[in-house]
């Protein structure tokens, strides 16, 4: 598939970990003495160290320049096939003097794992990648970006091989727009060529990005779902309906009236509710069917995807976070894993956990769209209720993801770093944000 400029394409064909193929289940490259013997480096130098995590062996990496690329090699890795999926795990500590929180970890080729790691403490790093082959020898890449003459320590390193016969979403492709605003938009392409969109983004640059992407596949959207009425989620579909030749076969949304929002909150987006309703009614040639989702509704979207409605939309209680809390959460079921789209859901997410059916549906999802752009959304209890989070989807540009008010990392008053730490401690391996230019993910 062609990767369009300004479009973040996440082809979630990551293979499920079905158990290691190595004898004993895991290929530990952190032998009692010999971690350094399993590593080679370009762009830096490696020395042995006893300063490892919990007393284990470590290697000290000194950066020659900004980027150092490690290659992990051993007999077990060499027994695998090129492009086999593996999980890499290690502990990382670095000297942050003058460069605190700036170290970045990549899988390879600019494919970012994460950044913003706290300095001078042991951070847990875990991600899926693939086996590379060069000159008949297999290896796994880990790329670190930092600063010349700075040091980092790597300890407790292990590589686990996993079967690659089961794509994460069963062949369904999930595409996240690389938003230039703080907006949210996801496109789903199924093996039977159904085009599904969730939200869409903010008027302006996001409209052009979405339009280019949709025209790559079709001039028609089969199913378009809107979580709530806020303009950073909905003005892109509004622009396409009003000004472009995109046809929407089925549009799913349920907004309160503008007057209701005005009466129950101080939300400044309240005029958009009625404007959008009028726009849809006045363009029946572009919007063929309008469906108002309700609690427990299920929609079969072709042969491969089912969308479930986990809660009713707006309510009649005054609330300072009314716009976000009036949204709908959708669960997308595929032949593989299930995806939870939370939109901007706030503290009302906990209310839906009290409903037996909703809780069961929520806790069984494994790919999670982080609520309200990954900060000040649903509670820790909401995320902790989800049993096995494999992937976090952040509809967040860099300044939100890094809590940056323009003065650098962690200088704003957002909740994003707390949520990132929560996911990191749970060992989530794959974190995707709309503010990072990603390549195709395995």
Language-model regions, residue ranges each:
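Extracellular beta-strand ligand-recognition surfaces/modules
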Residues: 126-158
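Active-site-proximal loop/helix segments of hydrolase catalytic cores
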Residues: 178-185, 191-217, 225-243, 310-400
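Binuclear metal-ion centers of metallo-dependent hydrolases, dominated by the metallo-beta-lactamase
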Residues: 250-252, 256-324, 391, 396-442
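Secreted extracellular polysaccharide-interacting domains
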Residues: 62-83, 100, 106-115
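Extracellular carbohydrate recognition and processing domains
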Residues: 109-137
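Sec-dependent signal peptide cleavage junction
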Residues: 18-32
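Extra-cytoplasmic beta-strand recognition segments
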Residues: 39, 59, 72-98, 125-129, ...
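Short carbohydrate-recognition loop motifs
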Residues: 48-67
């Amino acid at each position: 598939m062609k990767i369009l400029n300004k479009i973040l394409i996440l082809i979630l064909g990551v293979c499920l970990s079905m158990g290691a193929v190595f004898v004993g289940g895991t290929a530990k490259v952190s032998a009692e003495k010999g971690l350094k013997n399993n590593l080679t480096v370009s762009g830096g130098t490696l020395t042995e160290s006893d300063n490892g995590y919990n007393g284990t062996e470590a290697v000290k990496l000194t950066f020659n320049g900004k980027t150092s690329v490690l290659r992990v090699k051993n007999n077990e890795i060499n027994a695998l096939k090129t492009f086999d999926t593996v999980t890499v795990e290690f502990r990382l500590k670095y000297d942050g003097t003058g460069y605190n929180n700036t170290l970045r970890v990549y899988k390879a080729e600019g494919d970012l794992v994460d950044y913003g790691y706290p300095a001078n403490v042991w951070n847990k790093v875990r991600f899926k990648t693939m086996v590379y082959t060069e000159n008949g020898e297999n290896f796994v890449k880990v790329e670190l970006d930092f600063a010349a003459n700075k040091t980092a320590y790597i300890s407790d390193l292990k590589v686990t091989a996993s079967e690659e016969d089961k794509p994460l979403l069963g062949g369904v492709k999930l595409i996240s727009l690389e938003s230039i605003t703080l907006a949210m938009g996801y496109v789903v392409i199924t093996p039977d060529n159904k085009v599904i969109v969730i939200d869409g983004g903010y008027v302006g640059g996001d409209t052009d990005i979405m339009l280019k992407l949709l025209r790559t596949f079709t001039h028609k959207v089969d199913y378009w779902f809107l979580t709530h009425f806020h303009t950073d989620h909905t003005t892109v579909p509004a622009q396409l309906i009003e000004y472009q030749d995109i046809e929407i076969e089925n549009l799913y949304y349920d907004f309160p009236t503008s007057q209701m929002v005005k009466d129950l909150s101080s939300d400044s987006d309240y005029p958009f509710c009625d404007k959008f309703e009028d726009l849809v009614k006045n363009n029946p040639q572009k919007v063929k069917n309008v469906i108002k989702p309700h609690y427990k509704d299920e929609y079969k979207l072709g042969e491969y995807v089912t969308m479930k409605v986990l809660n009713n939309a707006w309510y009649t209680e005054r609330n300072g976070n009314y716009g976000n809390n009036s949204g709908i959460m959708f669960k997308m079921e595929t032949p593989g894993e299930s995806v939870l789209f939370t939109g901007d859901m706030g503290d009302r997410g906990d209310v839906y956990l009290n409903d037996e059916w909703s809780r069961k549906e929520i806790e069984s999802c494994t790919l999670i769209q982080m609520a309200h752009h990954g900060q000040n959304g649903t509670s820790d209890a909401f995320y902790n209720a989800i049993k096995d989070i494999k992937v976090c989807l952040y509809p967040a540009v860099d300044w939100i993801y890094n809590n940056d008010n323009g003065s650098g990392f962690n200088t704003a008053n957002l909740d994003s770093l707390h949520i990132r730490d929560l996911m990191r401690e749970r060992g989530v391996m794959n974190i995707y944000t709309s503010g990072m230019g990603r390549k195709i993910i395995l």
